[in-house]
Amino acid sequence: MPNVRIPTLSSLLRVLAASAIFPATGALHAQALPPGVRLGMTADELQAALPAAERVHRPQRLTGGLLGSWRAAPVEMAGLVFEPTFFFAASELRRVEYVATAQSAPDSGASAFGQLVQWGRGVFGNELASRDPGSAYAAWTSGDTDVYVQQISDPRRASVRLVYKARQLRDGSEL
């Protein structure tokens, strides 16, 4: 007879309890990339997946030829409203940024940052983290994707950022 493992009632209750915690945090419904969106897709594929996505009139430019040329409707995560921007390079989606201003939040976004870090731990495992007096950062790697959450706590420019980006491995000779 094959060795079939049947979940016990206690293990099912643990799974249900864990899933009940997630909606309570307010952070878990929108961190994943939108349905149908994946890094490496073209702008036409992005438009097909997100028909409401709009071209940005003044695209943000980042190093590596990244151009933040598309945006989607704001989404609420962890008590803040995040604006998603889609960055392309070489005709491929390479980066998705969710950015929320947090100047009006009494904690400058620290609570939202903490909720997003908890979400990241649940999805990706332990993070690589750093903290200094003006910011906090937590990062994970999942396959060919780097994911990070950053909080800037300066009251004049407080913000929280969640970023998905295509992983770029460098050869030591390139450094």
Regions found by a protein language model. Give the residues of each.
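Bacterial N-terminal signal peptides that target proteins for export
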Residues: 2-16
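A general, composition-driven signal for non-globular sequence regions
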Residues: 5-8, 23-25, 32
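Bacterial N-terminal signal peptides
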Residues: 14-24
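Glycine-centered flexibility motif
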Residues: 15-16, 79, 125
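Generic marker of residues within folded, mature protein domains
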Residues: 20, 74-76, 130
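Non-cytosolic coordination micro-motifs
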Residues: 29-67, 95, 99-175
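N-terminal, post-signal-peptide region of Sec/Tat-exported proteins
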Residues: 51-90
